[in-house]
Amino acid sequence: MREILLLGLALTLTGCMGLPKPDPNQAWVDLNVPADNALHAQQVDAQALDDHRYFEVQPGTHELTVRYQFTVAPDNIGPQATPLSRDCQLNIKYSNFNAGERYQLEAGSLGFTPWAKLYDQQRRLVGRAQPAGCQGA
């Protein structure tokens, strides 16, 4: 049991070590998603990203596009249904990104409907995403 805990800790630390150090001249956006779902940074201002684990943007106004993959539970579909995978894009525009600040983009779903919210460093809600299309995964 102890070996499993140590392995889990090592994997967690390895994953964190892979992220670059945030640039103090830019705003950093962390991605937060429930377990068993996936959230990926796709684009900033319609420009594709190389690294899908976070956003790093210049101060000012930007539109972020994320890809959110989640599973709709059977009780949200109907009797005797099986879980259904969804693959959605969402866009969120925010006009006041500040250099050196860290933001949190959280995603989730209500049944078939995905949502994402942007929070600033003080955990104030500063933006809500708009759906940009979904398909079955």
Task: Describe each PLM feature range.
Residues 1-18:
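Sec-dependent bacterial lipoprotein signal peptides
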Residues 16-137:
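Short loop/turn and low-complexity linker motifs enriched in small/turn-promoting residues
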